[in-house]
């Protein structure tokens, strides 16, 4: 299918884009900043500017696609809910949705009109409902979040041509690596400073990132799917259950609960995000045959963060799609000398030598570099070697207490998807993490941003 994806640069959008391409679909990403998207989108696609104010341009960009997926919307957790921010939360959801509907109206008599429109809402539709079991037929709640969701859904339905199949997913709290709720709370848990929020009895309607992506794929490609579906796992979890399981997996203690009054003072009106309770069930999707990979919170968290190699780690994950085949990309990245090309000049990075003629499991590689002017020696060992799919190097000696780097390579649509995952620890334990951690994190991120830029210069991308 030819699919137009609005919101492709977001947390769900990036995962979904990869899954769509893996499934053989042709994707057009409609984005606010095309130049930024060209560097950061980890899947091959056509990139168009998304300008909901220009209806003629939008209709032209949507024409010829079979389906539209709309994930647009500013993050609801990121900033304080000032009057201006609340207006942005409404407008960033409702205006793009309404603009897409108007574009579909203008195309309704055209052979190039899309026939499927999947758009998102959220379980915030139901409001704070305590222990009440909620499904797609439940009434909306009261408050800011239900009001946003109600207007969002109305915008998708109003004046939509009858020939267009509409699917609306009320998405729960999405759990995945590198973003969403887990991206915010995992560093807190790893530092050993986590505890229940309020009583801990409030319900969390969550969903694993893999399952929400697969539900979107299922709904777009299944012509019988229509109307509203709760995109939530079959087994909701209390905040206490979530906290206990995540702390257990990262091997850190649970501190005293954060009292409700403290959270309300600290977060203001946003406290409802952590204190509100929605016990939502995905009855619609299950009754129509959708199967979940991760049904309970234990399964999901074990998959996402059950492999920390040491407690208290920091982590970075970076993905990039390059427009050359795996047969060309892997040989370049397995050549340790090419690290000098991919590393920013401020590190004065040089490869000194290695213990074997060719890389293999057990190979030791020696480097020298300067970190903020301080000369350093770094030795790493290849602890896993499985060409051309992956290799793992582990620091033996160097500037970090721990540096564990997994390199993965996947053939994708004639090019190569590269995934880097680094788990690392700065020296001096908690003191080092608190004092130097933010600066180290900034350095690590800048190193990988430079690597992405250089790799794209060498091999091309979107």
What are these model-derived regions, one by one?
Residues 86-88, 97-143:
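Conserved Rossmann-fold NAD(P)-dependent oxidoreductase catalytic core, especially the SDR/UDP-sugar
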Residues 220, 280, 298, 306-356, ...:
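Hydrophobic ligand-binding cavity/cleft-lining segments
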